[in-house]
């Protein structure tokens, strides 16, 4: 099937939990817990801002979530250290399967990065991991001032990728993103990076499930 691929970035191509190593300096043995809460609240804050129609850049959500996670664990950061962690977020590590998968698909499918992140952040984190040049373009929610899983965001992605006449397939490790895309009429493949994670039972199923991006090329042949 001829289609365009839209890759989620955070959690799919790059690993937000990569911040736990840096947080060890501030949180000690609680670093992983802080990093997990940081990510959880980053998403929650973006969802809430989208529903409330009070859009702010994803970086603002990220900073607010960091402050919440630290405060919850009764930890403090200096302004300088907070800024350093925010800067480090722009160089999150890529998953090992990301670059090989994109290279194998490039030329066979139009590839786009599709994210709640803003363009400057996407360019930095993808460029840091040598992923940026694999894409035909970037699609950011910043263009329409809302966040996934708002249906308008997925509709916009169709327009931005030129996918009105052919299918657009989201590739994401975030179940909420996959459900949002499917509800909006897109194909969507769930990357189940953690075998212990279950897909939420909303009566909406992913188009396919893979455990690694290395399985993507073969899976696409069967959609």
Could you describe each region identified by the protein language model?
Residues 1-43:
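Active-site neighborhood of HAD-like aspartate-dependent phosphohydrolases
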Residues 19, 34-35, 81, 131-134:
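Hydrophobic side chains within well-formed alpha-helices
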Residues 1-2, 103, 114, 118-223:
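Asp-based, Mg2+/Mn2+-dependent phosphohydrolase catalytic module
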Residues 32, 46-83:
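A metal-dependent, Asp-based hydrolase signature
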Residues 29, 33, 53-57, 96, ...:
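Residues at secondary-structure transition points
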Residues 59-60, 77-113, 119-123, 151:
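Short, acidic loop-to-helix structural element flanking the phosphoryl-transfer center
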Residues 27-31, 72-77, 130-134, 162-163:
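Short helix-capping segments at alpha-helix termini
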Residues 21-22, 37, 64-68, 84, ...:
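Alpha-helical elements of Rossmann-like donor-binding domains used by nucleotide-donor carbohydrate transfer enzymes
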